[in-house]
Amino acid sequence: MIGFVIIMQKKIIIDTDPGQDDAVAILLALASPNELNVLGITTVAGNVPLNLTSKNARIICELAGRSELKVFAGSDSPMFRPLITAEHVHGKTGLDGPILPEPKMSLQDKNGIDFLIETLESHEPGSITLCCLGPLTNIAIAIEKAPEIITRAKEIVMMAGAYFEVGNITPAAEFNVFVDPEAAKIILNSSVKKTFLPLDVTHKLLVTKAQIEAFESFGTRVGQVISEMLQFSERFDKQKYGSDAAPLHDPSVIAYLLKPSLFSGRFVNVEIETESLLTLGMTVADWWGVSGREANANFIGDVDIEGFFNLLTERLASL
C-alpha cells in the first residue's frame, strides 16, 4: 500500500524591513512553495528607511526568480516616535555585502497597510498568517484603521522581543519592538493568536564559518549572495558579543511555519514597556507565571539548532 502525505499550503503575508536576515527569511519562504503561498510582501521602515526596504524586498524577489510577487510599501515611520534605523549593522543599503542590481519589478501603487486590510477582508477568516520580520507598525496601523480584520487573521508570527536575552539595541529592548513599542503593544492587546520568536531563540542560531561555506557550496548566485550578505552583517554582532559566529534572526519566523516541531516555548503573559525611558521597548514575558496576568502569547524559548540549519540549507539550495 502506498501512503501519501498531504501538505496543507499556508497563506502568508510577509511584513518586513530588509535587512540581510530578512532577505534570508524571504528566500526561505520563496524556496518553500509547497508549504507557503506568499500573497504579498509589505515593507516597513526599520533596519533602513522605507524607500530602501521597499527596494530590497524587490531585489530579493528577483534573486529568487519570483518577480511576479507584489511588494507594497507601508509606513515610513513608527506610530508616535521618530524612526531609529540600524545602518550600523546592515550598511547604508540594508543589504550591504554583495553587489546587487537595481530591481526591475515595480513597487505597487497601493499602500501596504491598505493591502493588509483588503487582503484579510477578502479571504476566508482564519486563513492568513502574518509573518512579521521588522517593526510592527504596519500591522498595528491596520488594526487601528479596521479593527475587525484582526479577527480574520489566523495568527501573527513575529521575530520580536526578548526575555532572558534582554536587549540588542538597548540593555532592555530588542530592536523591532524598540523601534515601535506602541505598535507592539497594540498587537499584544488584540485577540489574534500571537507567537514570538525572540532573541532567546535567535541568539542560539549562530551562523558559523562552516555554515557560510555550506551556502557557498551551493554553487549558485543565491548561495553566494547569502554568504556575502551574512559575512557583512555578522561583523557587528561578532564584535559586540565577542563570538566567532553571529545570530540569524528573521528566518526563525519562516522556519517556525515550515516545521514548528523544531521549536518549543510557553503560552505566557507578555507585556511591552512604553513609558519608561530606562526600559522603553522591554518585552516583559511572565515565563514563570508569577504575575497572575492572563496568558496572551506563545513565547518561544528554545530551538533545535541542527534541525533549523538543516532545513534552511536544504531549502535555500533549491533556489
Predicted feature locations:
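Short, Lys/Arg-enriched N-terminal segments with co-localized hydrophobic residues
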Residues: 1-7
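Conformational coupling and interaction surfaces
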Residues: 8-9, 28-31, 35-38, 178, ...
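Active-site histidine-anchored catalytic micro-motif
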Residues: 9-16, 20-59, 93, 100-203, ...
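Metal-dependent C-N hydrolase catalytic cores
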Residues: 10, 52-123, 295-303, 313-317
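Generic secondary-structure signature for well-ordered alpha-helical cores
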Residues: 34, 62-67, 76, 121-122, ...
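Acidic/polar N-terminal loop/beta-strand segments that form early-domain functional surfaces
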Residues: 43-46, 74-76, 275
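Short, mixed-charge aromatic SLiMs
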Residues: 48-52, 56, 80, 162-166, ...
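A residue-level signal for conserved active-site and pocket-lining positions in enzyme catalytic cores
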Residues: 71, 187, 254
